[in-house]
Amino acid sequence: MAQTVPGSDDAAVAATGVDGEVAVASTVAEERVSVASQWQLMWWRFRKHKLAMVGAIVVILFYVAVVFADFLAYADPEVSDAQRGLIAPQAIVWFDPDTGSFFPHVPGLVGKRDPLTFKRVYAVDPSVKVPVQFFAEGFEYKMFGFIPMNRHLIGVEGGNAEESIFLLGTDIQGRDMWSRLMYATRISLTIGLVSVAVSLVLGVVLGGLSGYFGGWTDTVVQRVIEILRSIPTIPLWMGLAAAVPQDWSVLQVYFVITIIISLIGWTELARVVRGRFLSLREEDFVMAAELSGCNQARIIFIHMVPLFLSHIIAATTLALPAMIISETSLSFLGLGMRPPAISWGVLLQQAQNVQTVAISPWLLLPAVPVIIVILAFNFLGDGLRDAADPYN
């Protein structure tokens, strides 16, 4: 006579219920994936890449600083004062040490002459507290290029060399390093962005023409690519940058340096685009578009390029760090942006003197955002590349 184990039916029902829920959940997930667009699938894969998400947040924060550089800078980056040269960085003290109340301030500075070098040096005077104001008034600027403003994130009222705030210290000419770093971030990151945009256009157009038409067009484009890639990049950039006249304006030099950096960057993307076009031009939808009377430009840019647009985005994101490094290197060597222009490379020019760096190590601080941005873009590019890979 068969015995019934108490609770066995309930356990079986519960197990069946759990399996059913798992099966339903699996079916729903599969159905969701089957109806998702390419961009949705990319986003789902991308957000699983934690380092890429961190890199994306860092990049967004830096470009927010690019847009609001004037607001974040509390001092005019061009105003110099020999009386406050090479002041060490100051830290904001958030609470009053005497009362314990919230009172953001920086300790005052006392200037005196060094009896050995006869240079003016500054010492901290804890008895003097310089209040730090948020949304303080300062030098005038134009937000977004057309809105006149004079408000800044932080600042102090008036003040002289002994009563001012210098978050990252000052350079040898007494210019505030924090404010100059904000403006340098704007120049360096926009040069990289514009250079990548130019490389993107050249790479897609020339690579697309090479792969779609083939024949002598493909031969000419590929030979040009091989010639450009056979020339050492740094000497080529240095030679072209050295040919820029010294009397050109900052805007003229900006666009010339952008073009010089873009000169080599488009070749790798052009080869990738050419390879994809060689495989796509034999597809049925291309033949259908040709038979329906579509012109060749429409076939290339409307029908073929969108099929691997995600790969192009990933490739351009990975190319951005190289562009930024190129501009910084050229400017550091004195062949890129030149004073009065402000870029990361221009700021690092003062760090070429070992003796100056030994006395004022904060002059090396502009190298920190360079490292952070390069790492962030590399993580972001890796995440986009993996997300754009349908076999990943």
Q: Where are the regions that the model predicts?
A:
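Gly/Trp-centered helix-boundary motif
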Residues: 1-200, 204, 340-341, 351-380, ...
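Alpha-helical transmembrane segments of integral membrane proteins
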Residues: 170-392
